[in-house]
């Protein structure tokens, strides 16, 4: 490529004389016989048909004359071409034609008056040769039918296509268009795409047609896929009137006016500066073609609506390079509202990469009140200050599309100071700083950009920067894919933000923004970070497969997290900490490798109407002084706990559906004191609610049912309050209190549970007040194993085994209780002499007097009911153990002698009943 250094000079004004007529080509050494001379029609009228037939026939046609050798000789004619050469061939001679080329079918002879010999005289204008049809004679009376001139007939009807095309290949575009006006055949041949492609590439160099259907719009096409039959000609017409910057060609062009006759609408210059001045002085449309080459240190300040486009074969932008080493390569100033620059490489390559004394540090600078179009450009900068593209100032509103802004040692695209603009389909990659900066009320529209592999953040909006980002692909940047800071407020819609080496979206220091319907995935840190009083809107996004969490809100962060699909992340789907208080609603948080929502370190927030399911750890964690409000969520199908309060976790859990967890629906431990009300908790494999290790809590108005173990567990010094709950249809007991558990149970309905409505054991001491315990399949209340209780105003009725059972050594405080209408199945079985094993089940054990038999060598772990002692062990050495809850080992068939009362054994368990202990969450092992 040529390297051109501009000279500061005015555009050269070169006179362009008309082309000089070339010398007529010499005829062959043995010219054919000359036809008889014809007189002009003005001097002699044409002979009648009878007289023409009497004339002497012409000699046989000679070979065709040689083709012209020079382009500017194509228009010349041979005065000595015989008329016989163009006579119609007939008879046997037609079969021995010297041409073995294809011919056009002869057209019907036209009726016309004879004209001046069309081959007579030489002229440089092809219009005179091919442009005139035969004139009709003006005669009085009836008109006569006369045949066309023989030469015209030969050219139009009999000359082979290949010969015509060869002749046409020497014509320039205007003469070719004139030839197309001669006849239908010439029109078809003159529009041959190969002819126009050759002309087109000679002028514009493009190897594919460059279409220019309207101002500011250029695009290349594949000719075979274009609907127009001749896209080369169509593009030629669209691009015809323009100036060309082609170093070294201008002198040749203006020195050969005859060779380029008809191209007066084309101007040629050696430098871009000359072309900019020339098109303005010549009042052209401002279309400038910059041909292949490297143009260095030109002063390109554009302040008019010019159009500048690269012109080169192959990949155009790679062949046309404009470079500056001192100041901004291109500067668009006020007045360049509709300017266009496209299909070229623009470089800023200063000698001192970090020099601070540069007046400007940009490849391309767009200033106030201008809206140019930058299209299909490659933009590079090696300067470590400034940016590759800078758009600044009120009214700066460019359109930058299909550009490649990459490998720059600074910011790729910088939009600031109220600038706007449309930026579409650009490739922005591998820049040392952010791919895009938006600052100080800049408000661009950025669509379908590919922003990747940056050595910093992908997009950085800060200091009140705004913008609308749509359908961008942002990935593999060293820091976050998208960063929002310091009151910036962008809108990001339907983008893909993924594979960030840190996070996906980072909003901090009072940043805002709307992030809507994006795909955020596979980032090394959180998909979305919100911190330090920031308040963005995160709506309708898919946030998945992150190497850490989904959404991470900390440091007084806020925000609306709504309608997102958050799944498959390595840590919690949403994490809220350190006084953060977001609104989290209508999200799906599922299939995480950790928990669903994790609120800790005094985190807050309103978490409502979410669906949290199928997570490996707890659906929701609340810990370390946090106080969120969880309302109307569906938390289900987890592999551990549904909602887990621990280490002083607080908050409100209300109106939620919590079901089908492998552990408990809710666990409360270690000083946690939540308010749990109006929830439905069912399907837990380890019970409904487990309160342990000094857990607290106010549990009110809940419905707790169909759990595999107890509806509510209270153990290990825990002291919750349960009011107005309905605890029913459990596959174990209603409420189990043991290991020093306490609590206030007030106004609850406890019914239809498989074991005791309330079981109190192992040094526990709860208060039961005004509860209704009924329709149980075992006892109403059982108190055993040195436990105590205060029972006030309870109603205990219609339970199968009985109302209240107290084991040996148990002392309770009772007041105003009503124990009535229970079925007393144990007493009835004893009175009928039945083995009490008959009324036991795998998990339901009757409370009565139990013994051991020394004769049968029973151990401390064996117990025998009173009827088996009387019948099966009559006369044996027996010992009373205590009045407590056992099943009969004699009836179960576990002793050496068979039971004579039980018959065939129907149970196979010898486990002592103390209600199988609940499984405590091991979530802490994963913190």
UniProtKB/Swiss-Prot annotation:
Residues 153-199 form the F-box domain. SMART domains: CASH, FBOX, PbH1, ZnF_UBR1. Residues 1-132 are annotated as: Disordered. PbH1 repeats lie at residues 395-417, 418-440, 441-463, 464-486, 487-509, 510-532, 533-555, 556-578, 579-601, 602-624, 625-647, 648-670, 671-693, 694-716, 717-739, 740-762, 763-785, 786-808, 809-830. Changing residue 206 to C: Found in a patient with lymphoma. CDD domains: F-box_FBXO11, UBR-box_UBR6_FBXO11. Disulfide bonds: none annotated. Changing residue 644 to C: Found in a lymphoma cell line; diminishes ubiquitin-mediated degradation of BCL6. This is F-box only protein 11. It comes from Homo sapiens (Human).
